[in-house]
Design a protein with these regions (language model features):
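Core RecA-like ATPase module of SF1/SF2 helicases and allied nucleic-acid translocases
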Residues: 2-190
Length: 190
């Protein structure tokens, strides 16, 4: 679904063109199939415990730490094609430099999947719903999607798709072994 016409990759490319169009004053670099541009919204797509970040704290020494984590969202502030690095300013004011090979850790974030949005809230959400596998088109997924919106929610899709999701209460049974694990630890489960 991510690769479909209304999938995350295509929508990100289209939204990038509209919201952050190419400009002679904005540096760009390509990594794989993704074109990154200064001003782009990006998301960290895996935990990196080693990447160093800094945060300017006015009136105090700069903070420094390690670790940018899956789901952190920010904006590309600078692309240096000579030294081959990209600077991202995250929404919590941490700034991190990525060398070009590290760009595999970030992706455009104009559009993100419902799965990637879990745990986040946004002032405005545009939810694009299309038909998909029943295991992905569930009431719980729809609930997760609509509760990401703090103030405004716009749903693009068919009412039939929404109705099917509301009626689809099936969840795949999980065989995690949790009960066995807790029993082995001596935990009594009633």
């Amino acid at each position: 679904m991510k690769n479909d016409k209304l999938g995350v990759y295509n929508l990100n490319s289209r939204l990038q063109d509209m919201l952050n169009p190419a400009d002679d004053d904005k540096a760009e670099c390509r990594f794989g199939d993704t074109l990154f541009r200064e001003g782009d919204r990006v998301m960290q797509n895996k935990n990196d415990y080693d990447i160093i970040w800094t945060r300017k704290v006015y009136g105090k020494p700069d903070e420094e730490g390690e670790g940018i984590f899956n789901g952190d969202i920010g904006t590309i502030m600078h692309i240096d094609n000579i030294s081959k690095y990209v600077t991202v300013l995250f929404d919590d004011e941490r700034s991190a430099d990525y060398n070009f090979p590290q760009l595999e850790e970030i992706e455009l974030a104009y559009c993100i999947s419902i799965h990637k949005s879990q745990g986040s809230e946004f002032p405005c959400v545009v939810l694009v719903l299309m038909n998909g596998p029943m295991m992905l088109m569930t009431r719980n997924i729809l609930y997760t999607a609509v509760t990401r919106a703090r103030s405004n929610l716009f749903i693009i899709g068919s009412s039939g798709c929404i109705e099917r999701m509301v009626r689809n209460t099936r969840e795949k049974r999980r065989y995690s072994g949790l009960l066995h694990f807790l029993t082995e630890l001596g935990t009594e489960i009633s």
